[in-house]
Amino acid sequence: SDGKDLIYQEILPGKGWKTNELTGRMLKKFARSGIQISTGENTDQILSIIRTELSKKVVSLDEKALNRLENLIVALSEREMLQITIAKEDNVFLGGAFFIHFGERLIYLKSAFLEEAKKSGVMYSVMFDKINASMERNNIFDFGGSRVPTVRQFNRNLGGLDQTYYQFTWDNSPFWFKMIVFLRNTFFRQKISSIQKM
């Protein structure tokens, strides 16, 4: 352990989920935008935007990290744990978001949208819809962990409540963290095993 706490946000069903005024304004802006959101299977298109848009802004999203993300997406899809939300305007693809559904928890994984869509409030709308669906199903919505203050504020704008876990202590890690480590280890063991059999 390195002694650092990591904060993540989640919303529990039945606890009076509330968003703030900024979220309300962004949802109204989105409603006027003409952008439509729906479920989809546009994995490659979303990953392409992550590569071109996010990798410029996030130093840790190097080629190795992007390949790991792609492998994780494949593993989640094969296990029918992946949910994808996409955004389009006049049939033009604007981006999408990946979520993990496991038991009674929906976990935000990663998203990427073109800049004009983000300015129209698409991310607020996508997250709001997913949170609302989670609450209706009596599921926990988990935003995941981030050390980035603006990400934490965005999650809190949408009603996320801070939770703390100790970063490298397995027993106190949030459920999504344990699951991703398990899937990653399982996926790579299978890959190595199949390569050795060739």
List the predicted regions and their residue ranges.
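Terminal substrate-recognition subdomain of acyl/acetyltransferases
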Residues: 1-35, 145-198
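A conserved beta-strand-loop-helix scaffold within acyl/acetyltransferase catalytic domains
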Residues: 1-118
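Aromatic (often tryptophan-rich) hydrophobic motifs at membrane interfaces
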Residues: 70-74, 78-178
